Amino acid sequence: MHLSDITHPNQLRNLNLSQLRSLARQIRDKHLQTAANSPVGCHLGPGLGVVELTLALYKTLDLDRDKVIWDVGHQAYAHKMLTGRYHNFHTLRQKGGISGYLKRSESRFDHFGAGHASTSISAALGMAIARDRRGDNFKVVAIIGDGALTGGMAYEAINHAGHLPKTNLMVVLNDNGMSISPNVGAIPRYLNRLRLSPPVQFLADSLEEQLKNLPLLGSSLSPEIDRLKETVKLVTAVQNNKAGIIFEELGFTYVGPVDGHNLAELLDAFELAHGISGPVLVHVATVKGKGYPPAEAEQVGYHAQSRFDLATGKPYPPTKPKPPSYSKVFGHALCKLAERDPRIIGITAAMDTGTGLDKLKEKLPDQFVDVGIAEQHAVTLAAGMACEGMRPVVAIYSTFLQRAYDQIIHDVCIQKLPVFFCLDRAGVVGADGPTHQGMYDIAYLRCIPEMVLMAPKDEAELQRMVVTGIQYTQGPIAMRYPRGSGVGVPLAEEGWEPLPIGKAEVLRSGGEVLILAYGSMVHPSLQAAEILKEHGISATVVNARFAKPLDTELILPLAEQSRLVVTVEEGCLMGGFGSAVAEALLDADLAVPLLRLGVPDVWVEHATPEESLAELGLNSAGIAERIRAKFQARVLKGSPAELPTVNS
């Protein structure tokens, strides 16, 4: 059977091992071809590692009834191909195409949406409890990676499920020893030992089956068989120090470890697990990047890939050289400062490469901490370090810091501890879509008393803000910066001067319009001012630098002299930078027209950052056009002949 003929996953139920193996090869080929030619890039290693797992599990289920909950979603590319999306798979992560993650609105087989890790067991348990309350009878399976198992939420769910012995729930642990980077901590170390141990549950259940088949005696031996099974598991555990006793103690029946690339073993394991009452965990050992040697050899680099040569595995060089990314500039600056100050500690939540802290990890490993996928712990860990005079720097994507909101307020801000939050991927993130957009940090941090918020206009100013954040000791301070390359300004190797807290700068003086731009929107606003000049509108452009405290000493006099005030931010309008300016104008009783440009009350779907910004009207042409329209309607009271439409 050809993969393109699969329109429903239940078609797998009638296939033999040979046909399943053929499908596995086709799935990997399709995944690799899509990744190698994708204009936006896609995740690679995780999906290649779960092909056999997906095929075997789906063969044992009735997916018209049963529900599979995938953790995160970039494991689920085989799932997408098997659930009616094969012919659209080439559009993966592109504007108008299929999502790179699970999405309930995209397919009836995507039972729970996810982009952040460690949520699957909680969601699956909720569905299982609802099923039992209604008296339904379908299977619920959560598939979680060992990286996601470093997140505390997974253990909260396991703890709950383990106390519900009559609730049938299967958890499949996809254990490849990695999240994006190699996993850290005691739990991954324990799982690594388990990967090498014999299949304990198979041994115990095989013994049970043989004893029960003894003539005359078998049916009367049930209590003794149970005790013998436990003895077998315990003896195996003692001999190998690797059996899944921790999961058994938490109330789960443990099955495994199973070879995640052996379809026959997987089918046996899943059939066995389906017959076990109560919570059961099937431990499947997989190889990230399986079937593509470059991805198996370099598992961190091939977690996700932009376009590459399939024959060699090497990425295609960019058409023209790009400036260094904000993440790299940040990592370099922090490393330079840490070399001179041993109090500086860089903290990440399983994202050392993505945040630029890999440089610190390499050069100064004693000043680097990776806590795993545990953002809550990362923030309170930093709070504890700050109590003891260290200078903790928490580098986390904007979207992931949301997971530690209580810790930010309760453990850091109330105690006025000098923790420096560095929010990477702030603003639109592109192909990852709504689960990863960094739209909300300005709003959710600005409302916290005494929190300082800053954003650089370019990579050179970012260097100065790193120094500013390190030297600020009066309490918490946060810096946000976008995904991708800087604007290409010259960079000094060191000697960066700190910025005065709460002070903005005027970059361009005009007269009629005052544009207050924050962070990544400064350069598009400068370009918009040039466009407006061509159409007879003069504009002052201010680099706000700080959303809190706002530089009212600079802003209010300029606003009073202007006919229109405009705020521009790459974040949500509700509660954001524009709201801060609106509050300041109201408090000062300044009745000047105000236009706030930013992200409205919508979910921003996956697309390239450029496509998203254009759609939101946050590129230079869009900013200029919206200012022109507002100026014409509210200030000039309508005179279209004077102001031609700006071409976007």
From Swiss-Prot:
Transmembrane segments: none annotated. Thiamine diphosphate binds at residues 74, 115-117, 147-148, 176, 292, 375. InterPro entries: Dxylulose-5-P_synthase, THDP-binding, Transketo_C/PFOR_II, Transketolase-like_Pyr-bd, Transketolase_BS, Transketolase_C. PROSITE patterns: TRANSKETOLASE_2. GO terms for biological process: 1-deoxy-D-xylulose 5-phosphate biosynthetic process; isopentenyl diphosphate biosynthetic process, methylerythritol 4-phosphate pathway; terpenoid biosynthetic process; thiamine biosynthetic process. It catalyses: D-glyceraldehyde 3-phosphate + pyruvate + H(+) = 1-deoxy-D-xylulose 5-phosphate + CO2. This is 1-deoxy-D-xylulose-5-phosphate synthase. It comes from Synechococcus sp. (strain JA-2-3B'a(2-13)). The lineage of its organism: Bacteria, Bacillati, Cyanobacteriota, Cyanophyceae, Synechococcales.
